[in-house]
UniProtKB/Swiss-Prot annotation:
Entry EC no(s): 4.1.99.22
InterPro entries: Aldolase_TIM, Elp3/MiaA/NifB-like_rSAM, MoaA_arc, MoaA_NifB_PqqE_Fe-S-bd_CS, MoaA_twitch, MoCo_biosynth_MoaA/MoaC, rSAM
Gene: moaA
Cofactor note: Binds 2 [4Fe-4S] clusters. Binds 1 [4Fe-4S] cluster coordinated with 3 cysteines and an exchangeable S-adenosyl-L-methionine and 1 [4Fe-4S] cluster coordinated with 3 cysteines and the GTP-derived substrate.
The species this protein was found in: Aeropyrum pernix (strain ATCC 700893 / DSM 11879 / JCM 9820 / NBRC 100138 / K1)
NCBIfam families, A to Z: moaA_archaeal, PRK00164.2-1
Stored PROSITE patterns: MOAA_NIFB_PQQE, RADICAL_SAM
Lineage: Archaea, Thermoproteota, Thermoprotei, Desulfurococcales, Desulfurococcaceae
UniProt: [4Fe-4S] cluster 2 binding residues: 252, 255, 269
Pathway: Cofactor biosynthesis; molybdopterin biosynthesis
UniProt keywords, alphabetically: 4Fe-4S, GTP-binding, Iron, Iron-sulfur, Lyase, Metal-binding, Molybdenum cofactor biosynthesis, Nucleotide-binding, S-adenosyl-L-methionine
SMART domains: Elp3
Stated name of the protein: Probable GTP 3',8-cyclase
Length: 355
């Protein structure tokens, strides 16, 4: 296993397999790879093949990576996505983030290929609000996707990005649906990446709008394996994950991932602005499979060496998070006198859970 200069291990590879999407969400972060929106289906040709992903999976696993998340765009648009799942499943757990629209057609085959779980982006269950967010009237299709995934035996977590003035009141409706159908719920603040950078000030809604009531309902508070997410387990058994990345050093403390774009570049962070170590270039050079695996390992190590937390605690008082301009005078440890509410429950004491 390898770790970065701040002691954070590299355990997860987040892979965008396509920039295409059948929706057009106005806040899409596009995995940090571009500030423009997704491409239309049929307008892009794959850069990396199934064999390439097999080599990437083996190289990553040799370095200690044991988890792969497939994203896009919309990963289900890619026709060979089940084959990509199958090769990566040889090396670790494979999960996927999807809008769910195509899950009724593909959930069963993905389960057979080795997919363990899905995150379904469902920011509203109102047809009108869903269309305002995604620019398509497709909420019924997305809901059918959730049901298809559950029927196929996949673990399901629904992602809801809180948007001020649009869907704040819908969280509790989604929670009731989660309890009825048996999926978990993840509430996310808008990321200042991709399109989200331009709309952050207008639409960001801190998740404390739901957290206070959640905390009074919960039977247990846990910590997610990735990003130190706060997780509230409710009496029904449903877990609600909270994702609040903005100006949150605790979130950065729990980052164990590198991102692979659809064109074969590696991003040490969703907010990264370059340089971009290229897996695609390493694979183009040919050679035996073993030679390719070693070259990809080298590129992954280069990306790991570039990993830096976006937000850290200031050394002199240990209380106020800031984005560093240099690595001097900063630390990535919980401060002794932290007063931020997000630290009050103690990340270090809450039970650690997968997912």
């Amino acid at each position: 296993m390898v770790a970065d200069a701040y002691g954070r291990p590299l355990k997860d590879l987040r892979i965008a397999v396509t920039p295409e999407c059948n929706l057009d969400c106005f806040f899409c972060h596009m995995e940090g790879a571009t500030e423009s929106g997704p491409m239309r289906p049929g307008s892009w040709s794959p850069v990396l093949s199934v064999e390439d992903y097999d080599i990437i999976g083996e190289a990553a696993s040799r370095l200690g990576v044991d988890s792969f998340k497939l994203t896009g765009g919309e990963p289900l648009i890619r026709g060979d996505v089940d084959k990509i799942v199958a090769v990566l499943a040889r090396y670790g757990e494979v999960s996927m983030t999807t809008n769910g629209i195509l899950l009724p057609l593909k959930a069963s085959s993905l389960k057979r290929a080795g997919l363990a779980r899905v995150n379904v982006s469902l920011h509203s269950i109102s047809e009108e609000v869903y269309e305002k967010i995604t620019r398509r009237r497709a909420v019924k299709l997305a809901l059918k996707g959730v049901e298809a995934a559950l029927k196929a035996g996949l673990r399901v977590k629904v992602n809801m990005v809180l948007l001020r003035g649009l869907n704040e009141g819908e969280f509790w409706r989604l929670l009731r649906l989660a309890e009825d159908l048996g999926f978990d719920l993840q509430v996310i603040e808008v990321h200042p990446a991709g399109r989200g950078r331009k709309v952050l000030s207008s639409f960001r809604r801190p998740i404390d709008v739901v957290e206070e009531r959640l905390s009074s309902m919960a039977v247990a508070v846990e910590t997610g394996r990735l990003h130190n997410r706060r997780v509230y387990r409710l009496p029904s058994g449903v877990r609600v994950y909270l994702v609040d990345p903005v100006e949150n050093p605790v979130f950065c403390m729990g980052c164990y991932r590198v991102r692979l774009t659809w064109d074969g570049r590696l991003l040490p962070c969703i907010y990264w602005k370059g340089p971009y170590p290229s897996v695609a270039e390493a694979l183009k050079r040919g050679g035996s499979r073993e030679e390719k695996v070693w070259r990809v390992m080298k590129i992954l190590l280069e990306a790991n060496a570039l990993r830096r937390p976006t937000y850290l605690f200031r050394l002199h008082d240990g209380q106020e998070p800031q984005a560093p301009s240099t690595g001097r005078g900063l630390r990535l440890t919980l401060p002794g006198k932290a007063k931020a509410e997000r630290l009050a429950y103690s990340t270090l004491k809450a039970p650690l859970i997968e997912g």
